[in-house]
Protein backbone atom coordinates (compact mmCIF):
# COMPACT_ATOMS: atom_id res chain seq x y z
CA UNK A 1 0.00 0.00 0.00
CA UNK A 2 1.13 3.53 -0.65
CA UNK A 3 0.83 4.57 2.96
CA UNK A 4 3.41 2.08 4.12
CA UNK A 5 4.23 2.84 7.74
CA UNK A 6 7.82 1.66 8.03
CA UNK A 7 8.54 -0.37 11.14
CA UNK A 8 11.83 1.38 11.73
CA UNK A 9 9.99 4.68 12.13
CA UNK A 10 7.00 3.64 14.17
CA UNK A 11 9.21 1.82 16.64
CA UNK A 12 11.27 4.93 17.24
CA UNK A 13 8.59 7.38 18.33
CA UNK A 14 9.80 8.98 21.53
CA UNK A 15 9.28 11.94 23.82
CA UNK A 16 9.06 15.67 23.07
CA UNK A 17 8.79 17.55 19.80
CA UNK A 18 12.00 18.89 18.33
CA UNK A 19 10.11 21.73 16.65
CA UNK A 20 11.29 23.97 13.84
CA UNK A 21 14.08 26.53 13.83
CA UNK A 22 12.72 29.99 14.63
CA UNK A 23 13.22 31.29 11.08
CA UNK A 24 11.26 28.39 9.59
CA UNK A 25 8.52 28.64 12.22
CA UNK A 26 7.91 32.23 11.14
CA UNK A 27 7.03 30.96 7.63
CA UNK A 28 5.07 27.83 8.57
CA UNK A 29 1.44 27.29 9.49
CA UNK A 30 0.19 23.86 10.63
CA UNK A 31 -3.57 23.37 10.44
CA UNK A 32 -5.38 20.58 12.29
CA UNK A 33 -8.09 19.43 9.86
CA UNK A 34 -10.19 17.76 12.55
CA UNK A 35 -12.16 14.53 12.16
CA UNK A 36 -15.52 13.14 11.04
CA UNK A 37 -16.58 12.87 14.67
CA UNK A 38 -14.09 10.28 15.86
CA UNK A 39 -10.62 10.70 17.38
CA UNK A 40 -8.40 9.93 14.37
CA UNK A 41 -7.94 11.26 10.84
CA UNK A 42 -5.19 11.00 8.21
CA UNK A 43 -4.61 13.11 5.08
CA UNK A 44 -2.97 11.61 1.99
CA UNK A 45 -3.62 13.82 -1.04
CA UNK A 46 -4.01 17.51 -1.92
CA UNK A 47 -4.67 19.29 -5.22
CA UNK A 48 -3.70 22.81 -6.26
CA UNK A 49 -7.06 24.13 -5.06
CA UNK A 50 -6.16 23.14 -1.52
CA UNK A 51 -8.73 20.32 -1.40
CA UNK A 52 -7.49 17.53 0.87
CA UNK A 53 -8.46 13.85 0.99
CA UNK A 54 -7.83 11.04 3.42
CA UNK A 55 -9.82 9.09 5.97
CA UNK A 56 -11.20 9.55 9.45
CA UNK A 57 -12.99 7.73 12.22
CA UNK A 58 -16.66 8.64 12.37
CA UNK A 59 -18.68 9.19 15.52
CA UNK A 60 -20.00 5.62 15.19
CA UNK A 61 -16.51 4.10 14.99
CA UNK A 62 -16.44 3.40 11.25
CA UNK A 63 -13.60 4.52 8.96
CA UNK A 64 -14.67 6.75 6.07
CA UNK A 65 -12.93 8.63 3.28
CA UNK A 66 -13.16 12.40 3.53
CA UNK A 67 -12.81 15.51 1.37
CA UNK A 68 -11.71 18.62 3.29
CA UNK A 69 -12.13 22.08 1.81
CA UNK A 70 -12.12 25.55 3.37
CA UNK A 71 -12.44 24.24 6.90
CA UNK A 72 -15.18 21.69 6.22
CA UNK A 73 -14.58 17.90 6.27
CA UNK A 74 -17.07 15.95 4.13
CA UNK A 75 -17.81 12.25 4.53
CA UNK A 76 -17.56 10.54 1.11
CA UNK A 77 -19.31 7.37 2.21
CA UNK A 78 -18.40 3.83 1.11
CA UNK A 79 -19.12 1.23 -1.57
CA UNK A 80 -21.50 -0.54 0.80
CA UNK A 81 -19.10 -1.69 3.50
CA UNK A 82 -17.96 0.03 6.68
CA UNK A 83 -14.51 1.24 5.55
CA UNK A 84 -13.27 3.62 2.86
CA UNK A 85 -9.97 5.46 2.37
CA UNK A 86 -9.29 8.33 -0.06
CA UNK A 87 -5.76 8.53 -1.44
CA UNK A 88 -5.60 11.22 -4.15
CA UNK A 89 -7.56 14.08 -5.75
CA UNK A 90 -7.10 15.87 -9.08
CA UNK A 91 -7.89 19.45 -10.08
CA UNK A 92 -11.39 18.42 -11.18
CA UNK A 93 -12.19 17.26 -7.66
CA UNK A 94 -12.21 13.58 -8.64
CA UNK A 95 -11.13 11.40 -5.72
CA UNK A 96 -9.71 7.88 -5.76
CA UNK A 97 -9.10 5.34 -3.04
CA UNK A 98 -10.50 2.03 -1.88
CA UNK A 99 -13.48 0.82 0.09
CA UNK A 100 -15.04 -2.32 1.42
CA UNK A 101 -18.04 -3.42 -0.58
CA UNK A 102 -21.15 -5.01 0.93
CA UNK A 103 -19.69 -8.54 0.67
CA UNK A 104 -16.48 -7.57 2.50
CA UNK A 105 -13.98 -7.38 -0.36
CA UNK A 106 -11.98 -4.18 -0.92
CA UNK A 107 -12.40 -2.40 -4.27
CA UNK A 108 -10.84 0.67 -5.86
CA UNK A 109 -13.22 3.60 -6.21
CA UNK A 110 -13.59 6.87 -8.10
CA UNK A 111 -15.67 9.54 -6.34
CA UNK A 112 -17.02 12.56 -8.20
CA UNK A 113 -20.04 14.84 -7.93
CA UNK A 114 -21.26 13.10 -4.80
CA UNK A 115 -21.19 9.56 -6.22
CA UNK A 116 -18.69 6.76 -5.49
CA UNK A 117 -18.07 4.34 -8.38
CA UNK A 118 -16.62 0.84 -8.01
CA UNK A 119 -13.71 0.45 -10.48
CA UNK A 120 -13.75 -3.34 -10.28
CA UNK A 121 -10.73 -5.64 -10.37
CA UNK A 122 -8.42 -7.51 -12.73
CA UNK A 123 -10.39 -10.69 -12.13
CA UNK A 124 -9.61 -11.23 -8.46
CA UNK A 125 -11.44 -10.18 -5.32
CA UNK A 126 -9.63 -6.99 -4.27
CA UNK A 127 -8.27 -3.76 -5.74
CA UNK A 128 -7.10 -0.34 -4.55
CA UNK A 129 -6.54 3.02 -6.28
CA UNK A 130 -3.81 5.42 -5.18
CA UNK A 131 -3.24 8.06 -7.85
CA UNK A 132 -5.28 10.05 -10.37
CA UNK A 133 -4.21 12.63 -12.96
CA UNK A 134 -6.23 15.51 -14.36
CA UNK A 135 -7.33 13.36 -17.32
CA UNK A 136 -9.05 10.94 -14.96
CA UNK A 137 -6.52 8.13 -15.43
CA UNK A 138 -6.18 6.09 -12.24
CA UNK A 139 -3.22 4.06 -10.95
CA UNK A 140 -3.39 1.30 -8.39
CA UNK A 141 -3.20 -2.45 -8.04
CA UNK A 142 -5.59 -5.36 -8.12
CA UNK A 143 -5.73 -9.05 -7.46
CA UNK A 144 -5.87 -11.06 -10.67
CA UNK A 145 -7.81 -14.25 -11.34
CA UNK A 146 -4.68 -16.20 -10.38
CA UNK A 147 -4.61 -14.54 -6.96
CA UNK A 148 -1.52 -12.40 -7.60
CA UNK A 149 -1.48 -8.60 -7.34
CA UNK A 150 -0.68 -6.53 -10.44
CA UNK A 151 -0.36 -2.79 -10.99
CA UNK A 152 -3.11 -1.29 -13.13
CA UNK A 153 -3.99 1.84 -15.09
CA UNK A 154 -7.73 2.54 -15.26
CA UNK A 155 -9.31 4.87 -17.82
CA UNK A 156 -12.88 5.27 -19.06
CA UNK A 157 -14.08 2.05 -17.50
CA UNK A 158 -11.16 -0.10 -18.65
CA UNK A 159 -8.62 -1.49 -16.15
CA UNK A 160 -5.32 -2.40 -17.83
CA UNK A 161 -2.86 -4.85 -16.26
CA UNK A 162 0.62 -3.25 -16.34
CA UNK A 163 2.51 -6.49 -15.83
CA UNK A 164 5.65 -7.00 -13.77
CA UNK A 165 9.44 -6.75 -13.82
CA UNK A 166 9.76 -10.51 -13.83
CA UNK A 167 8.58 -11.44 -10.35
CA UNK A 168 5.18 -12.40 -9.04
CA UNK A 169 3.55 -9.07 -8.12
CA UNK A 170 3.52 -5.35 -8.90
CA UNK A 171 1.87 -2.30 -7.32
CA UNK A 172 1.03 1.05 -8.93
CA UNK A 173 0.87 4.21 -6.82
CA UNK A 174 0.72 7.32 -9.00
CA UNK A 175 0.17 8.51 -12.57
CA UNK A 176 1.17 11.85 -14.13
CA UNK A 177 -0.36 13.78 -17.01
CA UNK A 178 1.71 11.83 -19.55
CA UNK A 179 0.18 8.59 -18.32
CA UNK A 180 3.45 7.47 -16.74
CA UNK A 181 2.86 5.21 -13.74
CA UNK A 182 5.21 4.82 -10.77
CA UNK A 183 5.22 1.92 -8.35
CA UNK A 184 7.22 -1.17 -7.53
CA UNK A 185 7.43 -4.74 -8.72
CA UNK A 186 9.07 -7.91 -7.54
CA UNK A 187 11.94 -8.89 -9.80
CA UNK A 188 12.14 -12.39 -8.32
CA UNK A 189 10.63 -14.19 -5.34
CA UNK A 190 12.26 -11.87 -2.75
CA UNK A 191 13.55 -8.59 -4.18
CA UNK A 192 11.45 -5.70 -5.48
CA UNK A 193 12.40 -2.58 -7.43
CA UNK A 194 10.77 0.75 -8.19
CA UNK A 195 9.39 1.00 -11.71
CA UNK A 196 8.27 3.60 -14.23
CA UNK A 197 5.65 2.33 -16.69
CA UNK A 198 4.97 4.13 -19.96
CA UNK A 199 3.25 3.05 -23.17
CA UNK A 200 3.26 -0.63 -22.30
CA UNK A 201 6.85 -0.79 -21.06
CA UNK A 202 7.76 -1.25 -17.38
CA UNK A 203 11.21 0.14 -16.61
CA UNK A 204 13.32 -0.89 -13.60
CA UNK A 205 14.54 2.27 -11.81
CA UNK A 206 17.21 0.51 -9.80
CA UNK A 207 18.07 1.05 -6.13
CA UNK A 208 20.14 3.17 -3.74
CA UNK A 209 22.95 0.60 -3.79
CA UNK A 210 20.67 -1.70 -1.85
CA UNK A 211 18.56 -4.60 -3.04
CA UNK A 212 15.11 -3.01 -2.70
CA UNK A 213 13.32 0.15 -3.81
CA UNK A 214 9.76 1.51 -3.86
CA UNK A 215 8.39 4.39 -5.97
CA UNK A 216 5.36 6.21 -4.55
CA UNK A 217 4.88 9.42 -6.55
CA UNK A 218 5.74 10.95 -9.93
CA UNK A 219 5.50 14.53 -11.20
CA UNK A 220 5.02 16.00 -14.67
CA UNK A 221 8.79 16.06 -15.29
CA UNK A 222 9.01 12.32 -14.73
CA UNK A 223 10.81 12.74 -11.41
CA UNK A 224 10.01 9.92 -9.00
CA UNK A 225 9.98 9.92 -5.19
CA UNK A 226 10.31 6.80 -3.08
CA UNK A 227 12.57 4.96 -0.69
CA UNK A 228 14.95 2.06 -0.29
CA UNK A 229 17.89 0.86 1.80
CA UNK A 230 21.01 2.99 1.20
CA UNK A 231 23.33 -0.03 1.07
CA UNK A 232 22.84 -3.82 0.84
CA UNK A 233 23.17 -4.65 4.55
CA UNK A 234 21.19 -1.67 5.83
CA UNK A 235 18.13 -2.31 7.95
CA UNK A 236 16.98 1.27 7.44
CA UNK A 237 15.33 3.03 4.52
CA UNK A 238 16.26 6.35 2.92
CA UNK A 239 14.08 8.67 0.88
CA UNK A 240 15.20 9.02 -2.73
CA UNK A 241 14.58 11.12 -5.84
CA UNK A 242 14.96 9.43 -9.23
CA UNK A 243 15.47 11.49 -12.38
CA UNK A 244 16.80 10.49 -15.79
CA UNK A 245 18.63 7.34 -14.65
CA UNK A 246 20.07 9.08 -11.57
CA UNK A 247 18.82 8.09 -8.11
CA UNK A 248 19.66 10.49 -5.27
CA UNK A 249 19.67 9.69 -1.55
CA UNK A 250 17.83 12.56 0.15
CA UNK A 251 19.30 11.79 3.55
CA UNK A 252 17.50 12.17 6.87
CA UNK A 253 16.72 14.73 9.58
CA UNK A 254 19.68 13.42 11.56
CA UNK A 255 18.38 9.97 12.36
CA UNK A 256 18.75 6.61 10.64
CA UNK A 257 15.83 6.48 8.24
CA UNK A 258 13.50 8.45 5.98
CA UNK A 259 10.72 7.80 3.45
CA UNK A 260 9.61 10.02 0.53
CA UNK A 261 5.92 9.92 -0.37
CA UNK A 262 5.14 12.98 -2.47
CA UNK A 263 6.71 15.20 -5.12
CA UNK A 264 5.33 18.27 -6.93
CA UNK A 265 6.16 19.82 -10.30
CA UNK A 266 8.95 21.90 -8.77
CA UNK A 267 10.78 18.82 -7.48
CA UNK A 268 9.89 19.52 -3.85
CA UNK A 269 9.65 16.23 -1.97
CA UNK A 270 7.79 15.42 1.22
CA UNK A 271 7.73 12.46 3.56
CA UNK A 272 8.92 11.66 7.04
CA UNK A 273 12.22 10.97 8.75
CA UNK A 274 13.77 10.00 12.02
CA UNK A 275 15.44 12.96 13.74
CA UNK A 276 18.70 13.01 15.68
CA UNK A 277 16.64 12.59 18.87
CA UNK A 278 14.98 9.46 17.54
CA UNK A 279 11.62 11.11 16.87
CA UNK A 280 9.66 10.93 13.62
CA UNK A 281 8.90 14.22 11.86
CA UNK A 282 7.42 15.26 8.53
CA UNK A 283 9.90 16.88 6.15
CA UNK A 284 10.03 19.06 3.05
CA UNK A 285 13.09 18.52 0.81
CA UNK A 286 14.17 20.99 -1.85
CA UNK A 287 17.47 22.10 -3.36
CA UNK A 288 19.48 19.47 -1.48
CA UNK A 289 18.11 20.52 1.92
CA UNK A 290 15.66 18.61 4.15
CA UNK A 291 13.55 20.82 6.43
CA UNK A 292 11.84 19.53 9.57
CA UNK A 293 8.15 20.49 9.44
CA UNK A 294 7.72 19.95 13.16
CA UNK A 295 4.63 18.96 15.11
CA UNK A 296 1.60 20.58 16.71
CA UNK A 297 1.88 19.83 20.40
CA UNK A 298 2.46 16.09 20.08
CA UNK A 299 5.52 13.91 19.62
CA UNK A 300 5.44 13.04 15.92
CA UNK A 301 4.23 13.97 12.45
CA UNK A 302 4.18 12.24 9.05
CA UNK A 303 3.67 13.79 5.59
CA UNK A 304 2.29 12.04 2.50
CA UNK A 305 1.27 14.55 -0.16
CA UNK A 306 2.31 17.92 -1.61
CA UNK A 307 0.76 20.20 -4.21
CA UNK A 308 2.44 22.62 -6.62
CA UNK A 309 1.98 25.47 -4.13
CA UNK A 310 4.17 23.66 -1.62
CA UNK A 311 1.27 22.79 0.70
CA UNK A 312 1.89 19.50 2.50
CA UNK A 313 -0.60 17.06 4.01
CA UNK A 314 -0.24 14.18 6.43
CA UNK A 315 -1.02 13.74 10.09
CA UNK A 316 0.20 14.87 13.47
CA UNK A 317 -0.06 13.69 17.02
CA UNK A 318 -1.98 16.38 18.89
CA UNK A 319 -1.32 17.61 22.41
CA UNK A 320 -4.10 15.31 23.59
CA UNK A 321 -2.36 12.30 21.99
CA UNK A 322 -4.86 11.94 19.14
CA UNK A 323 -3.79 11.56 15.51
CA UNK A 324 -5.31 14.20 13.24
CA UNK A 325 -5.02 15.00 9.54
CA UNK A 326 -2.90 18.11 9.07
CA UNK A 327 -2.04 20.72 6.47
CA UNK A 328 1.34 22.46 6.43
CA UNK A 329 1.51 25.76 4.57
CA UNK A 330 4.98 27.22 4.10
CA UNK A 331 5.17 30.85 3.06
CA UNK A 332 8.18 30.95 0.76
CA UNK A 333 9.80 34.12 -0.60
CA UNK A 334 8.21 34.97 -3.97
CA UNK A 335 10.11 33.79 -7.02
CA UNK A 336 11.92 36.46 -9.00
CA UNK A 337 10.62 37.37 -12.49
CA UNK A 338 13.62 35.58 -13.97
CA UNK A 339 12.84 32.41 -12.01
CA UNK A 340 9.19 32.56 -13.04
CA UNK A 341 10.11 32.94 -16.71
CA UNK A 342 12.48 29.98 -16.39
CA UNK A 343 9.58 27.92 -15.04
CA UNK A 344 7.41 28.96 -18.02
CA UNK A 345 10.18 27.88 -20.41
CA UNK A 346 10.19 24.47 -18.70
CA UNK A 347 6.40 24.33 -18.99
CA UNK A 348 6.59 24.92 -22.74
CA UNK A 349 9.34 22.30 -23.07
CA UNK A 350 7.12 19.71 -21.36
CA UNK A 351 4.32 20.45 -23.83
CA UNK A 352 6.75 19.85 -26.71
CA UNK A 353 8.07 16.64 -25.12
CA UNK A 354 4.53 15.32 -24.70
CA UNK A 355 3.61 16.13 -28.32
CA UNK A 356 1.02 18.80 -27.49
CA UNK A 357 3.14 21.40 -29.31
CA UNK A 358 5.44 20.76 -32.25
CA UNK A 359 9.07 21.86 -32.22
CA UNK A 360 8.40 25.00 -34.25
CA UNK A 361 5.64 26.18 -31.95
CA UNK A 362 7.75 25.46 -28.89
CA UNK A 363 10.81 27.23 -30.29
CA UNK A 364 8.78 30.34 -31.13
CA UNK A 365 7.37 30.53 -27.61
CA UNK A 366 10.69 29.83 -25.92
CA UNK A 367 12.45 32.42 -28.10
CA UNK A 368 10.08 35.13 -26.84
CA UNK A 369 10.71 34.09 -23.24
CA UNK A 370 14.49 33.95 -23.68
CA UNK A 371 14.45 37.40 -25.27
CA UNK A 372 12.38 38.61 -22.32
CA UNK A 373 15.15 37.45 -20.00
CA UNK A 374 17.73 39.33 -22.08
CA UNK A 375 15.70 42.54 -21.87
CA UNK A 376 15.30 42.14 -18.12
CA UNK A 377 19.06 41.75 -17.82
CA UNK A 378 19.40 45.09 -19.64
CA UNK A 379 16.69 46.60 -17.37
CA UNK A 380 14.68 47.32 -20.53
CA UNK A 381 11.31 46.69 -18.89
CA UNK A 382 9.08 47.98 -21.68
CA UNK A 383 10.69 45.66 -24.23
CA UNK A 384 10.35 42.76 -21.79
CA UNK A 385 6.66 43.56 -21.30
CA UNK A 386 6.09 43.71 -25.05
CA UNK A 387 7.65 40.28 -25.47
CA UNK A 388 5.50 38.81 -22.70
CA UNK A 389 2.41 40.24 -24.38
CA UNK A 390 3.48 38.66 -27.67
CA UNK A 391 3.90 35.37 -25.82
CA UNK A 392 0.38 35.49 -24.36
CA UNK A 393 -1.03 36.48 -27.77
CA UNK A 394 0.58 33.41 -29.33
CA UNK A 395 -0.80 31.19 -26.57
CA UNK A 396 -4.27 32.59 -27.18
CA UNK A 397 -3.92 31.81 -30.89
CA UNK A 398 -2.97 28.23 -30.04
CA UNK A 399 -6.06 27.96 -27.84
CA UNK A 400 -8.29 29.42 -30.55
CA UNK A 401 -6.81 27.01 -33.07
CA UNK A 402 -7.58 24.00 -30.89
CA UNK A 403 -3.91 23.12 -30.40
CA UNK A 404 -3.86 23.94 -26.69
CA UNK A 405 -6.76 23.15 -24.38
CA UNK A 406 -8.29 26.16 -22.66
CA UNK A 407 -7.05 24.90 -19.27
CA UNK A 408 -3.47 24.34 -20.44
CA UNK A 409 -3.31 27.58 -22.39
CA UNK A 410 -4.83 29.65 -19.61
CA UNK A 411 -2.30 28.20 -17.18
CA UNK A 412 0.54 29.57 -19.35
CA UNK A 413 -1.20 32.93 -19.75
CA UNK A 414 -1.67 33.17 -15.98
CA UNK A 415 2.02 32.42 -15.44
CA UNK A 416 3.04 35.14 -17.91
CA UNK A 417 0.56 37.63 -16.41
CA UNK A 418 2.06 37.01 -12.97
CA UNK A 419 5.43 38.17 -14.30
CA UNK A 420 3.87 41.16 -16.06
CA UNK A 421 2.24 42.27 -12.82
CA UNK A 422 5.69 42.58 -11.26
CA UNK A 423 7.67 44.27 -14.02
CA UNK A 424 5.28 46.15 -16.30
CA UNK A 425 4.29 49.75 -15.67
Regions found by a protein language model. Give the residues of each.
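Bacterial N-terminal signal peptides
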Residues: 8-17
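Residue-level hotspots at or immediately adjacent to binding/recognition sites across diverse folds
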Residues: 4-5, 20-333
Amino acid sequence: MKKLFSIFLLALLMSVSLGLPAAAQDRLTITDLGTLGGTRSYAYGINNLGQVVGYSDTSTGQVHAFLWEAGVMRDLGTLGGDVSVAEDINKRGQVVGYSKIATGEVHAFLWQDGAMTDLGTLGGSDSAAYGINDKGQVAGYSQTASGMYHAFLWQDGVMTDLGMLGGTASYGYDVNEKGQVAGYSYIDSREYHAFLWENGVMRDLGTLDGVLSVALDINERGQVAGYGPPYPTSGDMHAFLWEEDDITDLGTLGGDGSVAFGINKHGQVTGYSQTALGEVHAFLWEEDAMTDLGTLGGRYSLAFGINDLGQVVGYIQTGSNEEHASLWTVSLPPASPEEQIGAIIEHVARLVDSGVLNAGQGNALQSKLENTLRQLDKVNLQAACNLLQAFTNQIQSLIDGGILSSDEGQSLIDEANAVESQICP
